[in-house]
């Protein structure tokens, strides 16, 4: 039969069984690829039926709208006690039942698995159409049971893939359908949009089965027929009535995700109030706390405007929900602060959600909420990182697990992971797999080029290597698995599984929905971000210690503002441990920018970011700040927008204001411009604004050159344009931590170490910095140390830091707590008394002895190890028998070097001499200067230094430059390694613990760094000292 005749007689087709890449290592094509191809093939509809998941259905919905093809929502499931089915959603009831089925199946199984039974179908089958995927010899009893459940909503799926037995298979399946009394329908069991994805699909199958493709055997498909075939090809395989039946089913499936009716929680509103009246009441209660002398008329006007828009858009319950969570945290003395665009809102400020007065800082409300956008605002709240779980569990208790769950995060393949998985699947040796994966950047989405491959010892033209790289390139960006969002909550009035499936999280006592934040935005579901921030934990500890040791009660709101000493410290870049300005890039900027007031900190936080740097905004701003070029404005109207930043746009809000003032954008249009800035590289979303923006500016009298330059600067924001509200929220924590470091450095350092892990620096670096500042740091001692580091005042009130037992590597907190509890009853008599009364096992005793924590009871580590080894469990029969005194054993005292080595191995730090102090003579012989000697070196001089590598950073803004931080006995040396040198001497750069650097010293505006010319690994000089860098590996 001619192909043209086949096409004429084809009744049309809808694919009812198709897996996307959200089937996680089964489907080899994205929803966008599938819908584009289905549209090209003239399909009437396409069902996405990923196995027991709806994780990709929102993206499929978006793809369907883009390609103007109808989506049928569905899922493939395998019953534990029954057949394989494809369930298709007919209406809203069917969608709710499918969500409930998937939820049941996922919640009763381990993460990544599911268990679904016949009884589940009996409870949740209404509104669902079922396609029975039966073997050729499927039993009629199963069919009869299915028909009893689904009645006329049951079909037999017929999959034909050009197998040698297609004709027999078709005949048997038709007979089975007739025996059961149901209709048959054509299905493709589609796993890819085109045949060309067959190799990737085979590879993904091997990855899923944890084997090589050559070993996958029966798990692989026999051919590449599971793609979206043309209707002519389908007509060659299927009888026309089976093809026509696909359209009958498609016409019945009328559900659309736009039908979801999300409802906010309602129980937060007391009797006698509406959500709107209760929100207004809470705002009235909050105003005296924010403005003790009463709010100004302008504040009341803005508050009324915000409340009016919130009520108009129906978001009152959203604000009440966030307020309730924050109120709980404050009731438990958990420090928290809203950040991001919420800081633009006066309502959030008076509710206590944010700590920054948006009126005082001229923040733009439209960045937070606008009528045109008509979607829920996004409120992010940071909580102390070590107490956030209390807040998460409160939300679960408050709303129940059936109404509250965490959002998902879609973990996708980056280049390294894709290369690693594909290379394994294709059978490359393990050492080659590792070497090839290391050729990719950690988070890069680019396959390594030929030069990088050659440097790693690969033959770039090798066919086997090319195959790995091609398939890995196809896999990049595919979903790998779902994980839980750190704290993004979805909370609803109705059970969540009426909206989206819910499954168990990897962590106990948590549940997670199958959608991520982008999915939620698309369907309009409420999300509250309960995030963790280590600095809040440290600040709360600081405030507690200030109250205890100084009798001074401070909060974020009452820390003395605009303190000259604090800004002087910041301008000297003495900011180790300070929030947001402790990185080497920030420290290099501080002496140039020299912050003198709070808004300078807002700029400092925002300026060392990809957006301002790539938009060429940093250097013009600095030149104007240093009065090296005049401050000019294109018009008086734009002066109001840019005056705070000296005529240079630095913030997203300024771009929005510019568009409104200079190009006549409405606030909602300006917000769409902001959103497009973030997406333009991925979706080209900014180009439609070029003409609108440029023409609007030309109409208002601006030059074409100025308009084009502004547009290019806006594109720079696409990488990471920082919101002013976000920078201001962070600047508040930056200032608070700076003030504490300046005025209470012992308290600040103690709090940082107790809150670790957080920030850039290890406890060793923080404690050594404290010692350089003249703060006494006292050793770990079972006679004085608690689990946390503590503060011990002397007679004059000067505080010393007592190192806590938390620093002893391998010691459990429970053991430390038992030491504290037993010691509170009476002092230790000796090592044996400690071990027995504290109930320490052999492991805990050894950790304390090795960590030097027993010096007060045993003179040194050698004696301590000997004495803990001699402790015998006390048996009840001999409890009152006095042991015979033993002769003390004289052991050699450890050398300084041995103690130093043991300190680093067991504590990660030392209170003895710095390792480089012991090596200084040998380093001088190698021509190395110390950090303290650099003050006398002239700009441009060639010198050599050596130090412990305590940090390596390669910011994405730095064009491949690596910043290395070296530490010696006097301080830090900042080293700049250009890309060419880094690639040439990668082994020394990446692998050194003790690094010698030769290069040229540069000094400008108080910033000093060494431009590396040669790197040399001199780690053998350490003779095994345990010093670990914190870097980008």
UniProtKB/Swiss-Prot annotation:
Gene3D superfamilies per record: 1.10.150.870, Metal-dependent hydrolases (3.20.20.140)
EC main group: transferase
Keyword Nucleotidyltransferase: yes
Catalytic activity: DNA(n) + a 2'-deoxyribonucleoside 5'-triphosphate = DNA(n+1) + diphosphate
Keyword annotations from UniProtKB, A to Z: Cytoplasm, DNA damage, DNA repair, DNA replication, DNA-directed DNA polymerase, Nucleotidyltransferase, Transferase
Assigned GO CC terms: cytoplasm
Superkingdom, taxonomy of origin: Bacteria
Keyword DNA damage attached: yes
Main location as per UniProt: cytoplasm
CDD domains attached to this UniProt entry: DnaE_OBF, PHP_PolIIIA_DnaE2
GO biological process: DNA repair; DNA replication
Annotated Pfam families: DNA_pol3_alpha, DNA_pol3_finger, HHH_6, PHP, tRNA_anti-codon
GO molecular function, one term: DNA-directed DNA polymerase activity
Compartments where located: Cytoplasm
Entry's EC annotation: 2.7.7.7
Function: DNA polymerase involved in damage-induced mutagenesis and translesion synthesis (TLS). It is not the major replicative DNA polymerase.
Family: Belongs to the DNA polymerase type-C family. DnaE2 subfamily.
Protein name, UniProt field: Error-prone DNA polymerase
Lineage: Bacteria, Pseudomonadati, Pseudomonadota, Gammaproteobacteria, Pseudomonadales
């Amino acid at each position: 039969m001619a192909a043209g005749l086949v096409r004429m007689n084809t009744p049309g087709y809808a694919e009812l069984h198709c897996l996307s890449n959200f089937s996680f290592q089964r489907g080899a094509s994205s929803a966008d690829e599938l819908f584009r191809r289905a549209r090209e093939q003239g399909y009437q509809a396409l069902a996405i039926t990923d196995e027991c998941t709806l994780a990709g259905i929102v993206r499929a919905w978006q793809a369907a709208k883009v390609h103007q093809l109808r989506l049928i929502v569905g899922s493939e499931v395998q019953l534990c006690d029954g057949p394989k089915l494809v369930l298709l959603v007919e209406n809203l009831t069917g969608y709710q039942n499918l969500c409930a089925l998937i939820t049941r199946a996922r919640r009763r199984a381990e993460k990544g698995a599911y268990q679904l039974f016949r009884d589940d179908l009996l409870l949740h089958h209404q509104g669902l159409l079922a396609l029975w995927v039966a073997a050729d010899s499927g039993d009629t009893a199963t069919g009869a049971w299915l028909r009893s459940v689904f009645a006329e909503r049951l079909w037999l799926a017929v999959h034909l893939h050009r197998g040698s037995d297609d004709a027999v298979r078709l005949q048997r399946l038709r007979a089975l359908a007739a025996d059961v009394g149901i209709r048959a329908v054509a299905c493709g069991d589609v796993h890819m949009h085109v045949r060309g994805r067959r190799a990737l699909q085979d590879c993904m199958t091997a990855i899923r089965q944890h084997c090589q493709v050559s070993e996958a055997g029966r798990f692989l498909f026999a051919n590449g027929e599971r793609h979206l075939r043309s209707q002519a090809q389908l007509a060659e395989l299927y009888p026309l009535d089976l093809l026509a039946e696909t359209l009958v089913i498609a016409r019945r499936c009328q559900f659309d995700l736009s039908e979801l009716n999300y409802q906010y929680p309602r129980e937060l509103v007391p009797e006698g109030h509406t959500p709107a009246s209760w929100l207004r009441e809470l705002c009235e209660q909050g105003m005296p706390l924010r403005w003790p002398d009463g709010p100004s008329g302008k504040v009341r006007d803005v508050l009324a405007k915000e409340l009016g828009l919130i009520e108009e858009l129906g978001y009152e319950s959203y604000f009440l929900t966030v307020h309730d969570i924050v109120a709980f945290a404050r009731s438990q003395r958990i420090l928290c602060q809203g950040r991001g665009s919420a800081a633009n809102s006066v309502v959030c400020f008076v509710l206590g959600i944010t700590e920054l007065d948006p009126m005082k800082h001229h923040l733009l409300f439209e960045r937070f909420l606008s009528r045109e956008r008509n979607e829920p605002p996004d409120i992010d709240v940071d909580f102390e990182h070590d107490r956030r779980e209390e807040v998460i569990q409160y939300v679960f208790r408050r709303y129940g697990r059936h109404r509250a769950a965490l959002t998902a995060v879609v973990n996708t393949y980056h280049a390294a992971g894709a290369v690693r998985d594909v290379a394994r699947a294709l059978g490359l040796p393990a050492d080659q797999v590792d070497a090839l994966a290391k050729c990719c950047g950690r988070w890069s989405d680019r396959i390594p080029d030929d030069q990088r491959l050659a440097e790693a010892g690969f033959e770039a033209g090798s066919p086997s290597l090319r195959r790995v790289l091609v398939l890995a390139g196809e896999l990049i960006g595919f979903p790998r698995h779902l994980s839980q969002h750190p704290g993004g909550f979805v909370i609803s009035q109705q059970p969540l599984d009426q909206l989206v499936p819910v499954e168990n999280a990897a962590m106990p006592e948590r549940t997670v929905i199958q959608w991520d934040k982008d999915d939620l935005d698309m369907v309009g579901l409420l999300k509250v971000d309960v995030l963790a921030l280590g600095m809040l934990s440290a600040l709360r500890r600081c405030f507690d210690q200030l109250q205890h040791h100084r009798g001074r009660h401070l909060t974020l709101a009452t820390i003395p503002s605009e303190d000259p000493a604090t800004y002087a410290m910041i301008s000297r870049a003495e900011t180790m441990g300070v929030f947001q300005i402790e990185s080497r890039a920030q420290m290099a900027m501080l002496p140039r920018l020299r912050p003198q007031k709070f808004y300078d900190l807002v700029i400092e936080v925002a300026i060392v970011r990809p957006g301002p740097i790539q938009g060429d905004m940093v250097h013009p701003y600095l030149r104007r700040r240093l009065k090296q070029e005049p401050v000019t404005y294109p018009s008086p109207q734009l002066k109001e927008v840019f005056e705070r930043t000296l005529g240079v746009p630095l913030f997203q809000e300024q771009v929005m204001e510019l568009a409104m003032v200079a190009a006549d954008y409405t606030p909602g249009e300006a917000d769409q411009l902001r959103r497009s800035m973030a997406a333009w590289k991925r979706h080209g979303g900014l180009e439609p604004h070029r003409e609108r923006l440029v023409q609007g500016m030309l109409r208002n009298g601006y030059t074409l050159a100025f308009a084009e330059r502004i547009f290019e600067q806006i594109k720079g924001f696409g990488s990471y344009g920082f919101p002013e509200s976000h920078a201001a929220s962070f600047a508040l924590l930056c200032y608070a931590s700076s003030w504490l470091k300046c005025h209470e450095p012992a308290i600040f350092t103690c709090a940082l170490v107790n809150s670790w892990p957080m920030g850039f620096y290890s406890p060793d670096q923080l404690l050594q910095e404290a010692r350089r500042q003249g703060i006494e740091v006292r050793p770990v001692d079972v006679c004085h140390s608690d689990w946390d580091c503590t503060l011990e005042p002397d007679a004059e009130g000067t505080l010393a830091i007592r190192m806590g037992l938390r620093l002893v590597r391998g010691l459990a907190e429970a053991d430390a707590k038992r030491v504290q509890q037993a010691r509170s009853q009476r002092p230790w008599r000796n090592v044996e008394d400690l071990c027995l009364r504290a109930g320490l096992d052999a492991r805990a005793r050894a950790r304390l002895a090795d960590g030097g924590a027993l010096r007060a009871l045993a003179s040194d580590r050698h004696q301590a190890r000997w004495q803990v080894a001699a402790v015998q469990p006390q048996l009840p029969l001999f409890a009152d028998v006095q042991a015979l005194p033993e002769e003390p054993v004289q052991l050699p005292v450890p050398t300084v070097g041995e103690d130093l080595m043991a300190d680093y191995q067991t504590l990660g730090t030392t209170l003895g001499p710095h390792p480089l102090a012991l090596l200084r003579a040998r380093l001088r012989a190698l021509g190395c200067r110390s950090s303290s000697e650099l003050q006398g070196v002239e700009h441009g001089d060639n010198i050599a230094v050596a130090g412990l590598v305590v940090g390596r950073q390669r910011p994405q803004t730095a064009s491949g430059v690596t910043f290395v931080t070296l530490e010696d006995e006097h301080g830090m040396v900042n080293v700049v390694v250009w890309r060419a040198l880094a690639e040439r001497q990668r082994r020394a750069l990446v692998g050194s613990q003790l690094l010698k650097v030769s290069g040229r010293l540069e000094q400008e505006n108080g910033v000093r760094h060494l431009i590396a010319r040669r790197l040399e690994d001199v780690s053998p000089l350490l003779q095994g000292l345990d010093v670990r860098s914190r870097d980008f590996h």
